[in-house]
Amino acid sequence: MITRMKNWPCLLKRFSIQQFHQFTHLSGRLERAPQSGKSSRDPYLVTVVQGRSKKPRFPGERSNQRFGEDSWFVSSTPLAEVMGVADGVGGWRDLGVDAGRFAKELMSCCSGQTQLSDFDGRSPRNLLIAGFQELSHREQPVVGSSTACLATMHRKDCTLYTANLGDSGFLVVRNGRVLHRSVEQTHDFNTPYQLTVPPEDRKESYYCDKPEMAVSTRHSLLPGDLVLLATDGLFDNMPESTLLSILNGLKERGERDLLEGASRVVEKARELSLNASFQSPFAIKARQHNVSYSGGGKPDDITLILSSVEVPSV
């Protein structure tokens, strides 16, 4: 992914299939603190997080809630379960900027907003707006840009609310089939919509998309549904059919089974990203846009949040 800048002669930076061979790895179950006001009969999400960085982290880089230039958060409130992923735009590396820091700070701001008393869990787009405003209005804001995909499951009506800006995204899987899938927002090939805080002296050089441009959706959920949020490192390398074949192999929906399934998805996406002969979704899109690309997968950071909708046993 790149930063879109006005008057740049080339919008695509080629990826070398041999460039990234080592991936750092992190996964985990999420421990939830009890929530006052939450009914013991409300539906809830069993959630795991899995991911890989496309290359080893540099010394001192914080690993918490980051996979390379990707970031994520999960939050639980009395009204809703909330999760989000963000993909820092890699083009900032050429300007000497940590491309993942902006994504990390954006997710941190969004997570903090969920703890405010007026958060009702039904508008992740408003959550994204508030999180971005908090980040961009700091006295010394973090420079950079990222995509963002947020989702909330409101407990009382068991409804999934989403807001997606860029080419990260979400899936809802029911009975082995994709029930809903987000649609990418792009300016051009490999140039997604992105939230941006530009350098103070170069504001006119950047296209700055607004959080209000995020696409919002609403979907009723049922017990047993799977909700998946991921960055483009997954979607650019793994066909939907391959993803479903792994998810449909889950025998149970407990944390251990979900974590095993999420790990298999990430490992397979990593494998495909390094396969120079694989006709990946990214390679297919490049061909559709008449972009010269040697084919194969696209080495990238991969972040995945996988949740199963559950109801308390009586």
UniProtKB/Swiss-Prot annotation:
Gene Ontology MF terms in the entry: metal ion binding; protein serine/threonine phosphatase activity
Record keyword Chloroplast present: no
Residues of the PPM-type phosphatase domain: 43-309
Residues noted as binding Mn(2+) 1 in the record, renumbered to the chain: D87, G88
This protein's UniProt keywords: Hydrolase, Magnesium, Manganese, Metal-binding, Protein phosphatase
Matches recorded under InterPro entries: PPM-type-like_dom_sf, PPM-type_phosphatase-like_dom, PPTC7
Residues reported to bind Mn(2+) 2: D87, D232
Pfam families listed in its UniProt record: SpoIIE
The protein's Enzyme Commission number: 3.1.3.16
Catalytic reaction list: O-phospho-L-seryl-[protein] + H2O = L-seryl-[protein] + phosphate; O-phospho-L-threonyl-[protein] + H2O = L-threonyl-[protein] + phosphate
BP-aspect Gene Ontology terms: dephosphorylation
First-level EC class: hydrolase
Gene Ontology CC entries for this record: mitochondrion
Residue pairs linked by disulfide bridges in the UniProt entry: none
Names of required cofactors: Mg(2+); Mn(2+)
Domain of life: Eukaryota
Protein family membership: Belongs to the PP2C family.
Descriptive protein name: Protein phosphatase PTC7 homolog fig
Encoding gene (name): fig
